[in-house]
Amino acid sequence: HASTASRVHEMLKMRFFDILIASIFLIIACPFFIILSILIWTSGSKPFFKHKRVGLNGKEFYCLKFTSMKGLNEIEEAEQERVIFELDHFGKVNNDPRVTKIGNFIRKTSIDETPQFFNVLKGDMSLIGPRPITKAEMKIYGTKIKSYLSVKPGITGLWQISGRSNTTYSRRVAIDHYYALKRTRRMKIMIMMKTVYVVLFMKGAQ
């Protein structure tokens, strides 16, 4: 019972921290969000898009991002075929022709993911946790999916600071599993500190 009470206490403290940091960030970033939204709008895209992801206990939610790509039908036909092939076979696209000029910048700097602070405020995500996955990706996790579903997905996390795009998917699953089992306060502080370095120097971003 003592360990359960301690775990609940830790969760409440983390929730308070999430709300505090997300609120401060969104207030400060509001003017920047407006400017970036206008720039994306003038490039011919809607500023935001949402995609369904799986979170704590298997609950689905809409994860927010700034739009960084064109639609598939907006690129050349030959490139469309390449994109479809690489997505089907590798799960990602090298030198993706759908990425816009401004999209390339906001992806490299991870700015495209900053609207997820709204997800944190809502309670679907935490500041720290595994990267949110789709329902289709759940099968890749195998038996380790239980550990993924035991925590809230995060804006940053152990995998996100461990190379991100430079790591394999199986490595990502292993890292998410390890974090879910451990997730000590010391580990969370280390993740927050290293996140600043990773974002500033664009390590592992695509």
Q: Which role fits each region the language model picked out?
A:
Residues 5-74, 185-206:
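A hydrophobic, helix-centered structural microdomain
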Residues 3-12, 144-206:
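C-terminal terminal-structure detector
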Residues 89-151, 195-198:
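A short, structured surface patch at a secondary-structure boundary
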Residues 22, 49, 100-104, 136, ...:
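Positions in alpha-helical segments
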Residues 1-12, 94, 98, 133:
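Juxtamembrane loop-helix boundary motifs flanking transmembrane segments in multi-pass membrane proteins
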Residues 15, 46, 61, 94-100, ...:
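Generic recognition of short, well-ordered alpha-helical interface segments
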Residues 30, 109-112, 128, 164, ...:
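Residue-level signal for short amphipathic helical patches enriched in basic/charged
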Residues 49-97, 156-174:
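Short, glycine-rich, amphipathic interfacial segments at transmembrane boundaries or analogous
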